[in-house]
Amino acid sequence: MRIPLILMFALLAACSAVPPAQDPPEVGEDVQVPQVRIGREQVENVFVVVNTVEPVAEAYCLERAPDLNCDFQIVVDETAGAPPNAFQTQDDTGRPVIAFTLALLAEARNQDELAFIMSHEAAHHILGHIARQNQNARAGAQLLGGLAYIISGGSEDSIRAGVQLGAEIGARTYSKDFELEADALGTRIAARAGYDPLRGAEFFFRIPDPGNQFLGSHPANAARLATVQRVAMQL
């Protein structure tokens, strides 16, 4: 597994010793100097965690989902003003991509937190959550689109609105379950990689608690912590 150069450039730029009041060094027209700055120790933590967790996540992936592409790529999302966040997606070839925002890297206090977050995102891929979410979205779109057709008598605007609403509801229907599933498997991945998932899950206490919102995308922090504790006790 190779860490993309974009990660190296982003992290090195982020921990630059240049004071904010000074003009940043020239880094080329296609590279933006991030507004969020992280320390040298945090940069080192990221590299250690990525190099430690990725092989374990890949092994889990090959064991549980051998038909998937298990070659994880780790990148940094340099979107200006992006809040602390991490997410899993796929590139055009189906390769799994785990992205961290610089704000999250600055917020994480130790390697255990970084390891748990990365393991959680890897678990989303291993468990096939993107495909399952898309399937739910299609089902919701077909259902509400069909109802809109019947109720409106075939109005294109009504059908389009029904399809869009149905897709959104369908995608969110099981999203909380997906997050808890990823927490459970992420706990196992982080622990196998040598990290403390309970310590890593302390990150939950420093982010807003979504509570139990109807059609919310994430479960309450208490439910997530309980899942981590339950799985950790089984290890």
Predicted segments with their positions:
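Metalloprotease/metallohydrolase-associated module, dominated by Zn2+-dependent proteases
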Residues: 153-199
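Post-HEXXH active-site segment of zinc metalloproteases
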Residues: 130-160
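Long, well-structured alpha-helical subdomains associated
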Residues: 173-175, 192-235
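Extracytoplasmic/secreted envelope proteins and their assembly/folding machinery
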Residues: 43, 47-54, 101-102, 111, ...
